[in-house]
Curated annotation (Swiss-Prot):
Known function: Murein-degrading enzyme. May play a role in recycling of muropeptides during cell elongation and/or cell division.
A molecular function (GO) term: hydrolase activity, acting on glycosyl bonds
Lipid linkage positions (S-diacylglycerol cysteine): 17
Covalently lipidated residues, kind N-palmitoyl cysteine: 17
One Pfam family it belongs to: Mltc_N
Keywords associated with the record: Cell outer membrane, Cell wall biogenesis/degradation, Lipoprotein, Lyase, Membrane, Palmitate, Signal
Catalyzed reactions: Exolytic cleavage of the (1->4)-beta-glycosidic linkage between N-acetylmuramic acid (MurNAc) and N-acetylglucosamine (GlcNAc) residues in peptidoglycan, from either the reducing or the non-reducing ends of the peptidoglycan chains, with concomitant formation of a 1,6-anhydrobond in the MurNAc residue
Major location category of this protein: membrane
Residues annotated as signal peptide: 1-16
Official protein name in the record: Membrane-bound lytic murein transglycosylase C
InterPro entries, per database record: Lysozyme-like_dom_sf (IPR023346), Murein_transglycosylaseC (IPR023664), Murein_transglycosylaseC_N (IPR024570), Transglyc_AS (IPR000189), Transglycosylase_SLT_dom_1 (IPR008258)
GO-annotated biological processes: cell wall macromolecule catabolic process; cell wall organization; peptidoglycan metabolic process
Organism: Escherichia coli O139:H28 (strain E24377A / ETEC)
Amino acid sequence: MKKYLALALIAPLLISCSTTKKGDTYNEAWVKDTNGFDILMGQFAHNIENIWGFKEVVIAGPKDYVKYTDQYQTRSHINFDDGTITIETIAGTEPAAHLRRAIIKTLLMGDDPSSVDLYSDVDDITISKEPFLYGQVVDNTGQPIRWEGRASNFADYLLKNRLQSRSNGLRIIYSVTINMVPNHLDKRAHKYLGMVRQASRKYGVDESLILAIMQTESSFNPYAVSRSDALGLMQVVQHTAGKDVFRSQGKSGTPSRSFLFDPASNIDTGTAYLAMLNNVYLGGIDNPTSRRYAVITAYNGGAGSVLRVFSNDKIQAANIINTMTPGDVYQTLTTRHPSAESRRYLYKVNTAQKSYRRR
């Protein structure tokens, strides 16, 4: 509630990404919540534009961590796809001091998304003894950054040697960009391998598929959010996939935001939903490869939309798929699915899964 109040008061916050919802169960409450949430995101983007200037709007998404502080005048942006960390400020006084503080806190922040309120400018980032970015960033001497002393020295080096500035027409924007190590994606993935293996054994879902979904959904960003209010590493939506999984486990209601921001809980829930798609919603598809293509596409756009590509009758759709080769099923889903995002999604996840199978 506190986060939504902050959203409403400051006209509010960040989040941007896929608008696709996991699952096909569209209920009125979910639609109202999502529409209201989307309106607040639009208002927040407008407010950031007023503060930072035209074409300077940066908001959090599945693969982008964005945290504003200093009355929204300083921001930290981690692009987990590109592997860059950009710290910027439009503070009119002592901009270097604002940047230095933000650099240190970003480098040393922990990996508990529920402790950071992305919906306000509150400086609630705590320095951790186990920084989330440890090993994903090295300082100017090539050393990983764990302690405040090393982070402070690196911040001083960056401000002296890499400080940039540009004008947005009204203000000067000061910035520092840090490149992550080349294998930053693998470094993040490694953090969650134990959780992935546990979920894989529990639900009978291939580890490579879980990892491929995580890479495609969030680039292993535990802070991942979206305009459809999908949360965490596997971008689970509380009121659809989350509710389906809870119901299958004999639980009432929906998983909380803090539950889905917990990496282990998120991976467990996302994997449970993959198992439901495979064993229940799409269980009538006989060929395991064809069924895997259908499951991947359904994780993005829903099982119903997958089956309707082949027939409006679900049983007939499965029968039609069972007469096709896996290659033809893949070709059909990547060319005839009504959602361009879902068509691309199957290609991305399938490609990523191949890379994890080779390891």
